[in-house]
């Protein structure tokens, strides 16, 4: 029996811990689909971070380009012009070597015609072997370019399949997760006006309606506002499991980060998203269509069914390769 060598290109957790939920979920789904695999996880963060600081990327050593593997797996918002600009050369290099490209729960960034055109041209030159989308529009845009295609879901929903949360010695709590990117500018005023009229000092207090308030932030690179620490009960970490312990137990999550909502829903807890990002379409795929308008409880059976079907699709292809 052959063991498949899989190169997983991900990372960038310190810029957005939601990337960790995607990466860990994707890797777990791969192992569920095919136990006979060896996964080599290589970070794409050097190019991402160094590009922010205008570094000379021609001097970056691309470890991914020299690892011997059978498949290259990408997950998350990788179908974007920026991702292709930063990582397209190493992807093309691997495909020319005979490595098969697997997009496992992929999606776009802006979903503009310009982005779609850029990604389409890249995938025509570097066609995926397996293409699993995380939202319906992405599937419709690119599925025809792959040998095997599936209308799937975001890999972040798999976090509840591998992570066992700790018991917390805490009263009931809610999570507020708002970063200065990715959502409406006036979320603070909206929350106070529409959700917490009883307490106008919500963002300086530690409780609301008898529930503890815990404030998480998903990013501290390339900047971390000092105002974060003017508020009580702040969690900022480079460890995704710290966040998952909270999202697994919260009574509700209010956020402008898509993957704070993904993780919360995955653990069968309600969430509300304060963002108009087109990436939020991935929440529609699991039935959370109202999450932008109101606190929304997950359809946990639908989430389980979607995960199971996605793993079955992947398993049928990969297991056959190992036999």
Place the predicted regions along the sequence by residue.
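Active-site anion-handling motifs in enzyme catalytic cores
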Residues: 1-323
